[in-house]
From Swiss-Prot:
One of its GO terms (cellular component) is ribonucleoprotein complex. It comes from Methylibium petroleiphilum (strain ATCC BAA-1232 / LMG 22953 / PM1). The gene is rplI. This is Large ribosomal subunit protein bL9. It holds the Pfam family Ribosomal_L9_C. Keywords: Ribonucleoprotein, Ribosomal protein, RNA-binding, rRNA-binding. The keyword Ribonucleoprotein applies. GO terms for biological process: translation. PANTHER family: 50S RIBOSOMAL PROTEIN L9 (PTHR21368). Coiled coil: none annotated. GO terms for molecular function: rRNA binding; structural constituent of ribosome.
Length: 150
């Protein structure tokens, strides 16, 4: 299926590009999320009319993400979780827990933006985590997992 990208999509293309993707990817993800539109003749003409407006919105979104990234980069957050004597957690700290802790600290982060390269955190200590605020803005955050023993 031919689609027009309405925003930058990682590993696919930039705003305004007409790309060919699998039908399911377009119908089930890109079009419902507002990232793309079917590339019909009328849609292409409408897009060209709105192109400047969409580029301004994309630039504003990027600037907001960069400003948030400057504040967030290098921050350390602390999460308390039940742990055994050996420093292993009962359960784990997931991207949902980290996003929630960042939200309490005043940052707008959703769990899909938190990247855990080695999977959920299962030990007490300090762990580096990356947060992708935008496709072009990726920051590093330190998560300190504190074990509580009862």
């Amino acid at each position: 299926m031919q689609i027009i990208l309405l925003e930058k999509v990682a590993n696919l293309g930039n705003l305004g590009e007409v790309v060919k993707v699998k039908d399911g990817y377009a119908r089930n993800f890109l079009i419902p999320s507002g990232a793309a539109r079917r590339a019909t003749e009328t849609a292409v003409k409408e897009f060209e009319a709105k192109r400047i407006e969409l580029e301004k919105a994309a630039a504003a979104k990027l600037a907001a993400s960069q400003a948030e990234g400057e504040k967030l980069n290098g921050k350390t957050i602390s999460i308390t979780q039940k742990a055994g004597v050996d420093g292993r957690l009962f359960g784990s700290v997931t991207n949902h827990d980290i996003a929630e802790a960042l939200g309490k600290a005043g940052f707008k982060v959703v769990k899909s933006q938190v990247r855990l390269p080695n999977g959920p955190l299962k030990t007490v200590g300090e762990h580096p985590v990356t947060v992708a605020l935008h496709t072009d803005v990726v920051v590093d955050v330190n998560v300190t997992v504190v074990g509580e023993t009862d």
